[in-house]
Amino acid sequence: ASVTNGEFSYEFIVPKDINYTYGPGRISYYFANDSVDGSGFTEKIIVGGSSDEVTNDETGPLIELYMNDSNFIFGGLTDENPSIYALVNDDNGINTSGTSLGHDISAILDKNYTNPILLNDYYVATLNNYKNGKIIYPLSGLSDGNHTLSIKVWDVNNNSGKAYTEFVVANDAKLAISHVYNYPNPFT
């Protein structure tokens, strides 16, 4: 949220994964600009119940998955230290709470399902918009060759979206030259 004269407001939809019993809640927040950062919280809030304005949402988040930036193409080249770069959108918001079993934002590198990469803390909502944001997560020390990456993101209504990409780590000119793409096409 934008801060003006030390004040801010923010709207969001509470995930379905809450305890619906009325009771005390807590809102934690973090703020930063170019010269200062800080955090705080309030416990002056009662949480519970549900809204009469329930939406019929059965569609998961839309995810655009890249390596390093949005110029990446499926099967493209990276170095051994690329970043997961994902753009995420959902009309009702992204669930980043991490409080419900199996509803974390997660990535699977090279089909290693026993060691998912948890990305909840790496999701950053677009300023003043809870409906979309991006994930940037640094990877390091990847071996030369072909790699796969899948990502799963949940919205606040417990719908999931998935995306998948493949990439090649190439620190060797011979490997890199064997993986040529005509992109963008046509060349200008």
Model-derived features: where do they sit?
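An acidic-aromatic loop/edge-strand motif
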Residues: 53
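Surface-exposed, proline-anchored Ser/Thr-rich loop/turn motifs
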Residues: 66-69, 77, 172-188
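Short, solvent-exposed loop/turn segments enriched in Ser/Thr/Gly
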Residues: 80-82
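Long, low-complexity serine/threonine/glycine- and acidic-rich segments characteristic of extracellular
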Residues: 1-50, 64-67, 71, 85-171
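Boundary/junction segments of secreted and surface-exposed precursor proteins
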Residues: 59-63
